[in-house]
Every structure is written in C-alpha cells, then in structure tokens.
C-alpha cells in the first residue's frame, strides 16, 4: 500500500528501519525527484522539488539499503 511522506527527517527515520529493503529514485522532467522506499507493509514516497536537497538526501540514505535510480526514458 502506498503512503506519501512530506517530512525529510521522517523519511530518513523510516529508511533506517529494519524492514526497509530498497529505495528507488525517480527524476521527472519537471525537476521533481521522487524517493520511493519499500518496506514490508507500505511503499513510502517523498517528493523533493530542490535538486540540491535531493542529492543530500540520496547521500544520507543508509549504505546497506539497495538504491536504484530510475531516469527519464530516452
């Protein structure tokens, strides 16, 4: 089931949980970056409009989390 999160700190807390298995980063054409975090019960989504904040958030994800980048189709 999907859940949308608006707070970056809350997203990072969920990413550090034991049931967080993978994260997908999707960059849209309108400069939005979506972070999708797969946990056992929910798929959490965070939308970041600022590219610099998105890069900092990507670097602060836990290293044991599998991160996949999904870009625009060519």
Swiss-Prot record:
Coiled-coil features, chain-numbered ranges: none
Biological process per Gene Ontology, one example term: protein-RNA complex assembly
Signal peptide: none
Pfam families: Ribosomal_L38e (PF01781)
GO molecular function: structural constituent of ribosome
Compartment(s) of residence: Cytoplasm
Keyword set, alphabetical order: Cytoplasm, Ribonucleoprotein, Ribosomal protein
UniProt cross-references to InterPro entries, sorted A to Z: Ribosomal_eL38, Ribosomal_eL38_sf
Main location: cytoplasm
One of the record's GO cellular component terms: preribosome
Highest taxon of source: Eukaryota
PANTHER family in alphabetical order: 60S RIBOSOMAL PROTEIN L38 (PTHR10965), LARGE RIBOSOMAL SUBUNIT PROTEIN EL38 (PTHR10965:SF0)
Additional comment: There are 2 genes for eL38 in S.pombe.
Self-association state and partner proteins as the record states: Component of the large ribosomal subunit (LSU). Mature yeast ribosomes consist of a small (40S) and a large (60S) subunit. The 40S small subunit contains 1 molecule of ribosomal RNA (18S rRNA) and at least 33 different proteins. The large 60S subunit contains 3 rRNA molecules (25S, 5.8S and 5S rRNA) and at least 46 different proteins.
UniProt family annotation: Belongs to the eukaryotic ribosomal protein eL38 family.
Function (record text): Component of the ribosome, a large ribonucleoprotein complex responsible for the synthesis of proteins in the cell. The small ribosomal subunit (SSU) binds messenger RNAs (mRNAs) and translates the encoded message by selecting cognate aminoacyl-transfer RNA (tRNA) molecules. The large subunit (LSU) contains the ribosomal catalytic site termed the peptidyl transferase center (PTC), which catalyzes the formation of peptide bonds, thereby polymerizing the amino acids delivered by tRNAs into a polypeptide chain.
Protein name, per record: Large ribosomal subunit protein eL38A
Organism: Schizosaccharomyces pombe (strain 972 / ATCC 24843) (Fission yeast)
Lineage of source species: Eukaryota, Fungi, Dikarya, Ascomycota, Taphrinomycotina
Gene that this sequence comes from: rpl3801
């Amino acid at each position: 089931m999907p859940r949308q999160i608006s707070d970056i700190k809350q997203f990072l807390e969920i990413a550090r949980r034991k049931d967080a298995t993978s994260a997908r980063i999707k960059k849209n054409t309108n400069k939005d970056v979506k972070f999708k975090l797969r946990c056992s019960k929910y798929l959490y989504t965070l939308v970041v409009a600022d590219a610099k904040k998105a890069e900092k958030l990507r670097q602060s994800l836990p290293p044991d989390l599998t991160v996949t980048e999904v870009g625009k189709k060519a």
